[in-house]
Design a protein with these regions (language model features):
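Metal-dependent enolase-superfamily TIM-barrel catalytic cores that perform enediolate-based chemistry
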Residues: 124-234
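Glycine-rich, aromatic-flanked loop segments that form ligand/cofactor-binding clefts
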Residues: 98-99, 104-138
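C-terminal extensions of enzymes
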Residues: 327-367
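Conserved, mostly hydrophobic/aromatic
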Residues: 3, 35, 42, 70, ...
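Metal- or metallocofactor-binding catalytic centers and their adjacent structured scaffolds
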Residues: 5, 38-114
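Shared catalytic-loop signature of beta/alpha-barrel
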Residues: 65, 222-237, 245-341
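Hydrophobic faces of well-ordered beta-strands that scaffold small-molecule active sites
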Residues: 45-47, 129-137, 158-162, 190-194, ...
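Structured beta-strand/loop patches that form or line metal/cofactor-binding pockets in enzymes
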Residues: 1-44, 50-54, 323-328
């Protein structure tokens, strides 16, 4: 089943609400690159990657050139063997995992379609689970964040990510965590995320001020060592995100006793092939996971949901329905959140059929 063509589109995803994070990071209009692999068997596979500006070592303008550079490896390759193809890509071009993620997702879509299975079954798991969602709250005024949390709690959400640090105001961050915790009551998971934007001192001060509450912290600082110092000083559980991007960094976080939970993002690791290895390591270590991607629409959301659905339920902390935060929807037939949960699509492969009218004209085609 050889790859015969690669088509690329660019879609501007508009956030329903401007998304503010620490250190000047925002999500408003973000460029997503959509990829389709066609094969001589008449089976096509879809991929997507949507890098957030200034967030990770990735940028949207680099996706198409990287994929075009990999064309000699991809054209004619057997798409039914995703990991073999990705190993060849890694040998030909080091790094650029974000661009490779879209390729790997599409390869898994093709291979699981050929097998006649939803991707989660192709990956070896059918736990029949509803996947718990979290709702991410943009870093705005504390009382507004509490209002959003209460509204989402009323809809059934039980996990809340509270963005911190956008205004570099410790007192405001303390209020954000305290008011959201109060708004959702006892039981739901509440965690404050600085996206690497805090110093260890500021994160420690905020953490100690809310240490009497049921709160988890997420990636306050830029390094594992700094995060570990905050974890030790506050005695609050911590989730790592930006610092974990392969099996070696996951082991480093675990050995530093700072990784109570980990964010496994498709484009951060390089696609489904790499993410399932990271997932299996976390299961072996007993670490709960958030299985998602940085940003995106229905294709990347579906890929992450399939990985989540093939993961033992006790290790799935949560997933994210990224496509609910942005417009346009590329496929209106896919599952949506319901009382705090979502399921993976049940069709073969990713189960995604993007609306070509919404994609518009391709920006590149490789024959």
């Amino acid at each position: 089943m050889k790859i015969t063509s690669i088509t690329l589109w660019e879609v501007m995803l508009k956030s329903h609400q401007t998304y503010y994070m620490a250190d000047g990071k925002t999500c408003d209009d973000v460029r997503s690159v959509i990829l389709r692999l066609d094969t001589d068997a008449g089976i096509s596979g879809w991929g997507e990657v949507c890098p957030i500006p200034h967030y990770l070592p990735a940028y949207a303008e680099g996706v198409v050139p990287a994929i075009e550079y990999l064309a000699p490896v991809l054209m004619g390759a057997d798409a039914s063997h995703p990991e073999v193809v990705m190993a060849a890509c890694d040998h030909y071009l080091q790094g650029h995992l974000y661009a490779k993620s879209a390729i790997d997702i599409a390869l898994h879509d093709v291979a699981s379609r050929q097998a006649g299975l939803p991707l989660y079954k192709y990956l070896g798991g059918d736990y029949g689970q509803k996947l718990p969602l979290y709702h991410s709250i943009t870093c705005i005024a504390p009382d507004e964040m509490a209002r959003i949390a209460a509204e989402e709690k009323a809809k059934g959400m039980t996990q809340f990510q509270v963005k911190l640090g956008a205004d570099r105001n410790n007192e405001a961050d303390i209020a954000r965590l305290s008011l959201v915790r109060e708004a959702v009551g006892a039981g739901p998971l509440v965690y404050g995320d600085w996206n690497c934007g805090a110093t260890s001192l500021d994160a420690t001060r905020v953490g100690r001020a809310v240490s009497h509450l049921d709160i988890m912290l997420e990636q306050p600082c830029a390094t594992i060592a700094e995060c570990a110092s905050v974890r030790q000083a506050t005695n609050l559980p911590m989730k790592l995100d930006e610092n974990v991007f392969d099996t070696h960094s996951l082991l480093a976080g675990y050995q530093a006793k700072v990784m109570d939970a980990a964010a496994l993002k498709l484009s951060k690791f390089g696609g489904v092939s790499a993410l399932r290895k990271a997932r299996d390591l976390c299961v072996s270590l007993g670490v709960k996971m958030c299985i998602e991607d940085t940003w995106g629409s229905d294709i990347t959301t579906s890929a992450a949901l399939h990985v989540g659905a093939s993961t033992p339920p006790q290790f799935v902390m949560n997933v994210c329905d990224l496509s609910s935060y942005v417009a346009p929807k590329l496929d209106n037939t896919l599952p949506v959140r319901e009382t705090g949960y979502i399921t993976a699509p049940t069709g073969v492969g990713l189960g995604v059929a993007p609306d070509l009218d919404k994609l518009g004209a391709p920006i590149a085609s490789i024959q």
